Design a protein with these regions (language model features):
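An N-terminal amphipathic alpha-helical segment
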Residues: 1-116
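Short, aromatic/basic amphipathic alpha-helical patches
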Residues: 115-129
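C-terminal edge-of-domain segments
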Residues: 127-157
Length: 157
């Protein structure tokens, strides 16, 4: 797994810029309310601006980033996906991993809808390489512990 992944680092930068702009917009909203009131044209314009300021990433992209960041925090040698993906998220998730240069990932989700994701991965061109066990490091109550986790390894084709 690429620990210093420029692709994901750029996502982080853009996300932080979005958050800073959102905080600034919220501060401006309060200034508009204080200076012009609730029924002002300025506040209506602010609402239009805020509605246009959509978060830059779809949820599948966010889940790919979170899987990468969490895998790094857990000191894993390979990307682990432990979350369920909705049908609308699968393509964005996999395209994001491909864009980041990730070649394989281990799917460890244990929800009742795992089969949906397995078939969706195959439909999007992934190859199931087989069952595997990975080791993750977690910090619980201040103690670092190693955990063996069962999963299915996929190759991104």
């Amino acid at each position: 797994m690429l620990i210093n992944n420029a692709y994901f680092e750029n996502f982080k930068r853009i996300g932080r810029e979005y958050e800073a702009a959102r905080v600034e917009r919220q501060a401006r909203k309060q200034q508009i309310i204080d200076n012009y009131g609730w029924d002002s044209a300025e506040l209506k314009a602010w609402y239009e601006e805020d509605a246009a300021a959509k978060f830059p990433y779809e949820s599948g992209v966010c889940k790919a980033y979170r899987a990468w960041a969490t895998s790094i925090c857990r000191k894993e040698t390979e990307l682990e996906m432990d979350d369920f993906l909705w049908e609308k998220e699968v393509r964005d998730f996999l395209e994001t991993l491909r864009g980041a240069g990730i070649e394989t990932f281990v799917y460890t989700n244990q929800s009742t809808a795992v089969m949906e994701n397995l078939h969706a991965f195959a439909a999007e061109g992934c190859t199931m390489l087989g069952l595997c066990t990975i080791t993750r490091q977690e910090t619980r109550w201040g103690e670092e512990e190693l955990y063996e986790v069962q999963g299915i390894r996929f190759r991104l084709n």
